[in-house]
């Protein structure tokens, strides 16, 4: 009865909320959000530098998140490179001196705070000069120093960081006359600061709050009320300058949350001072170094030649899409299946496809690529950095697994690793990887090591699936190869052109493509051994095992010959495909990390198909895979193996050391046995996970730009100020886009890859010319 009610309820929901309706809702949300953010940028503050300097919040201990953009954590080498041949002056009181020390420690962490309290402090590092000038009050002495810089009689700094107020409050006991004099003195230097701002960067540091409870008697008059009055005076006076002196307010906001940790109530704890220093460094250097994880103070990058050509093609496609109209969209496609929400497969031959179909598909793909560009290249949407907490990873993990169990259904097949089960496997792994990426869980080594197993499991499935196909069907035709390569690479090739990223940037697709080529070569080259050939002959089975052993030795040889490996892949045109930032090292690292996973998948497929052929497995519904004794034994060993691996991974302290062990330690086989030995487990699958499994490749690639941001370094912000709602909305749009791209890829594959040899060879020749042209243009770029 409960099952009937569940099925009726599911049918009722799908009648009103089909996949098509979900996509229409997602498209409407994209349009509204784009208009909202574009209008906010146009009519409001569109400068991310203003956001960086003015506001933010703590994500966790000492992790500062500016409003709407990402803060890059500068290393010493980066800071030195950015500030080479620059003169920087910190002007003010003891609080500015603290900021000065935090700033120069980013250039040289070994610096000690040993300068005299009320004197100037010089700092020279190579050809960079950073000086602290002691001016505790805004007075004539300060005005004279600023005048020297404007008149050119003293070397003018490239950057001036200035601020003072607490001494004025202290010396005049917080009297109102002192505030009036402070305003007058600020007015007197406002024009001078304006002139300096014409050729230098000038920052006025707003006063941080104090912790009144622990202030000494001599500082009791420095209250937060007084601090606020002096800050208001500074803003109202200096805001009138045409060049608009920049206000550093972010450190003040950070101090509001941490001032209670102050020892004397006046000076900030070092971690809070570091926030102000890092904000300043981002403001000065992001536009120079353009770090991908530092989106503050960066404008949209200029279009490359390839991007301009891609934009022209996509624009023509969009025009065709609009002209054809939505009414003619896939007339031959039947209505969606109410039960599953998926469109039913049309039985018509490929040759009967409506010629408008490919144009409509390309038009939709063009609009989707426009959304990708707006999300992660144009200066429209906000971005925030990741911050790992255990709850951010494990709570969503528990939630999706509860959903997965809730949507358990009887599988149509009960064979080991049947299609529904492999889709389920890919689905839950992909969801875990998505949560892993958005939560920044790579910072937690035990989670990182478990996710490494999931990536290896994808490659294991690659070996298992393609070996099984070639072994059973013996189809080594060009059509099959082109179909696989097109489905794997179509989205990535388009993204490389639109997002101006190298092929290796989307590392998983090059990895899977490479291993598919290896599997194909292993199975297709002489001696070509197939199941029908090996039937009844142990010799051919042994020959295939020797072939796999040869592949294993080949892999081992390259794994221990890094120079040879890098030498081969550094030759053009392979270098253009596998290099990242001019180096082949990333490809070497990715390849080496899971080098045995594909061979393990091939070997497992061979052994399984052999056992199946000789009827040594019980794959009936509800039956254990082996006899009860063997099944229980294998289950026990598998569970112990799983637990042992988890304990080992939890004890990992160093990523590089654990990565060295990773290729030799695998629990993939243990998982397969646990999932398949019990008959009841093999008879069920999660339709929830299986649905995501069918679009797992698209989900993995699309996350780079429309769910995460800054090429996976940050998080896309569609709904500012509400992280939970933002994740819900961006995830909904992201999944709908991935599903649509999957359908577009499948549709275009039928048209782009004809079965006839003649047309197929012509298109391959065209694809080759296109590839050479793209590689040549990218080299010139």
From Swiss-Prot:
It is a multi-pass membrane protein. It catalyses: CMP-N-acetyl-beta-neuraminate + acetyl-CoA = CMP-N-acetyl-9-O-acetyl-beta-neuraminate + CoA; a ganglioside GD3 (d18:1(4E)) + acetyl-CoA = a ganglioside Ac-O-7-GD3(d18:1(4E)) + CoA; CMP-N-acetyl-beta-neuraminate + acetyl-CoA = CMP-N-acetyl-7-O-acetyl-beta-neuraminate + CoA. Its EC number is 2.3.1.45. The keyword Ribosomal protein does not apply. Keywords: Acyltransferase, Glycoprotein, Golgi apparatus, Membrane, Transferase, Transmembrane, Transmembrane helix. Residues 37-308, 376-386, 452, 499-504, 559-595, 651-660, 709-714, 778-781 are lumenal. The active site is at 94 (acyl-ester intermediate), 264, 267. The chain crosses the membrane at residues 16-36, 309-329, 355-375, 387-407, 431-451, 453-473, 478-498, 505-525, 538-558, 596-616, 630-650, 661-681, 688-708, 715-735, 757-777. It comes from the Eukaryota. It is found in: Golgi apparatus membrane. GO terms for cellular component: Golgi membrane. Glycans are attached at residues 139, 185, 239, 654. Residues 1-15, 330-354, 408-430, 474-477, 526-537, 617-629, 682-687, 736-756 are cytoplasmic. InterPro entries: Cas1_AcylTrans_dom (IPR012419), NXPE4_C (IPR057106), SGNH_hydro_sf (IPR036514). Pfam families: Cas1_AcylT, NXPE4_C. One of its GO terms (biological process) is carbohydrate metabolic process. Key enzyme in the biosynthesis of O-acetylated (O-Ac) sialoglycans such as gangliosides O-AcGD3 and O-AcGD2, which affect various processes such as cell-cell interactions, host-pathogen recognition. Catalyzes the transfer of an acetyl group from a donor, the acetyl-coenzyme-A molecule (acetyl-CoA), to the C7/8/9 OH-position of a sialic acid residue. Belongs to the PC-esterase family. CASD1 subfamily. This is N-acetylneuraminate (7)9-O-acetyltransferase. It comes from Danio rerio. The gene is casd1.
């Amino acid at each position: 009865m409960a099952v009937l009610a569940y099925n009726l309820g599911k049918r009722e929901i799908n009648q009103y909320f089909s996949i098509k309706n979900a996509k229409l809702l997602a498209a409407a949300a994209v349009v509204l959000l784009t208009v909202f953010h574009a209008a906010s940028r146009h009519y409001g503050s569109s400068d991310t530098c203003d956001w960086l300097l003015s506001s933010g919040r703590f994500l966790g201990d000492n992790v500062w998140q500016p409003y709407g953009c990402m803060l890059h954590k500068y290393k010493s080498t980066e800071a030195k490179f950015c500030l080479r041949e620059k003169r920087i002056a910190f002007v003010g009181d003891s609080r500015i001196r603290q900021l000065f020390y935090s700033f120069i420690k980013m250039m040289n962490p070994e610096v000690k705070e040993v300068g005299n309290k009320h004197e100037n402090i010089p700092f020279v590092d190579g050809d960079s000069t950073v000086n602290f000038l002691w001016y505790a009050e805004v007075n004539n002495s300060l005005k004279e120093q600023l005048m020297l810089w404007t008149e050119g009689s003293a070397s003018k700094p490239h950057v001036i960081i200035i601020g003072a107020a607490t001494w004025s409050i202290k010396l005049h006991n917080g009297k109102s006359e002192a505030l009036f004099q402070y305003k007058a003195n600020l007015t007197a230097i406002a024009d001078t600061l304006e002139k300096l701002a014409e050729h230098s960067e000038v920052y006025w540091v707003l006063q941080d709050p104090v912790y009144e409870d622990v202030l000494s008697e001599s500082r009791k008059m420095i209250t937060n009320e007084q601090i606020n009055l002096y800050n208001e005076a500074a803003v109202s006076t200096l805001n009138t300058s045409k060049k608009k002196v920049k206000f550093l307010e972010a450190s003040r906001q950070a101090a509001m949350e941490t001032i209670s940790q102050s020892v004397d109530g006046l000076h900030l704890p070092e971690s809070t001072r570091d926030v102000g220093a890092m904000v300043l460094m981002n403001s000065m250097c992001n536009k120079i170094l353009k770090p991908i994880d530092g989106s503050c103070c960066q404008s949209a990058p200029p279009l490359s030649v390839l991007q301009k050509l891609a934009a022209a093609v996509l624009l023509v496609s969009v025009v065709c899409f609009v002209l054809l109209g939505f009414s003619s969209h896939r007339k031959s496609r039947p209505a969606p299946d109410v039960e599953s929400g998926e469109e039913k497969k049309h039985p018509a031959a490929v040759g009967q496809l409506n010629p408008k179909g490919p144009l409509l598909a390309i038009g939709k793909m063009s609009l989707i690529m426009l959304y990708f560009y707006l999300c992660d290249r144009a200066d429209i949407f906000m971005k925030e950095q990741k911050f790992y907490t255990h709850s951010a990873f494990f709570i969503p993990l528990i939630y999706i697994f509860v959903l997965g169990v809730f949507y358990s259904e009887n599988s149509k097949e009960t064979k080991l690793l049947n299609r529904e089960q492999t889709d389920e496997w890919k689905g839950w792994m992909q969801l875990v990887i998505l949560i892993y990426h958005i939560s920044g869980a790579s910072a937690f080594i035990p989670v990182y090591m478990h996710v490494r197993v999931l990536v290896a499991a994808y490659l294991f499935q690659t070996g298992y699936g393609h070996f099984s196909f070639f072994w059973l069907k013996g189809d080594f035709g060009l059509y099959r190869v082109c179909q696989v390569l097109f489905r794997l690479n179509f989205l990535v090739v388009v993204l490389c052109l639109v997002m101006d990223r190298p092929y290796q940037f989307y590392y998983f697709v090059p990895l899977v493509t490479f291993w598919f080529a290896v599997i194909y070569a292993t199975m297709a080259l002489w001696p070509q051994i197939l199941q029908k050939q090996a039937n009844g002959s142990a010799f051919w089975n042994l020959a295939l095992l020797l072939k796999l052993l040869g592949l294993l030795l080949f892999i081992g040889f390259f794994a221990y010959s890094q120079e040879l490996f890098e030498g081969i892949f550094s030759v053009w045109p392979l270098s253009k495909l596998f290099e990242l930032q001019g180096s082949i090292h990333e490809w070497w690292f990715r390849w080496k990390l899971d080098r045995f996973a594909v061979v393990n998948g091939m070997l497992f497929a061979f052994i399984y198909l052999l056992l199946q052929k000789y009827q040594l497995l019980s794959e009936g519904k509800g039956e254990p895979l082996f006899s009860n004794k063997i099944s229980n034994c294998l289950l026990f060993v598998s569970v112990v193996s799983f637990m042992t691996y988890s304990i080992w991974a939890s004890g990992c302290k160093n990523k590089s050391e654990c990565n060295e062990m990773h290729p030799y330690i695998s629990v993939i086989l243990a998982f397969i046995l646990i999932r398949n030995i019990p008959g009841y487990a093999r008879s069920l699958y999660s339709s929830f996970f299986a649905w995501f499994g069918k679009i797992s490749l698209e989900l993995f690639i699309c996350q780079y730009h429309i769910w995460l941001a800054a090429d996976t370094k940050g998080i896309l912000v569609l709904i500012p100020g509400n992280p939970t709602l933002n994740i819900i909305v961006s995830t909904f749009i992201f999944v709908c886009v991935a599903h649509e791209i999957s359908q577009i890829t499948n549709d275009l594959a039928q048209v782009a890859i004809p079965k006839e040899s003649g047309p197929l060879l012509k298109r391959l020749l065209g694809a080759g010319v296109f590839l050479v042209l793209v590689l040549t243009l990218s080299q010139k770029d």
